[in-house]
Amino acid sequence: MSLLFTVYEEVGHGGSVVPADTQDMISVDMGCVGADLGCTERMVSICAKDSGGPYNYDIVSELAACAKANGLDYAIDVYPHYGSDVEATLTAGFDIRHGLIGPGVYASHNYERSHMDGVRNTFELLRAYVAQ
């Protein structure tokens, strides 16, 4: 297992290079909160699709099943105006399963607000998923 920390999703190249043996990649970013979305600041968001297209169905399903099995507060949402570092990985030609999770965050960039429960649910989902 590799842990990669990137901070370049805003410019589109954060995940453009990953170890050659990478099979799965889960990006941890922010989940959106707002009208027509299921996520709140207290939840972990599991993104099914964003501006780059759908995330891997099996990964999304596995994350949702893991969240449910561990009693975590979660929502599955679609973010049409959002992108993550996983997009750069796919654009670079890596054929991997990919997913995106994150704590629900109200607003972004200039004023981001979340709740410790959202951060906890995100951490617990990641921990449980990696441990299985």
Where are these regions (language model features)?
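Active-site-adjacent substrate-binding region
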Residues: 44-132
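Acidic/histidine-rich catalytic neighborhood of metal-dependent amide-processing enzymes
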Residues: 1-50, 86
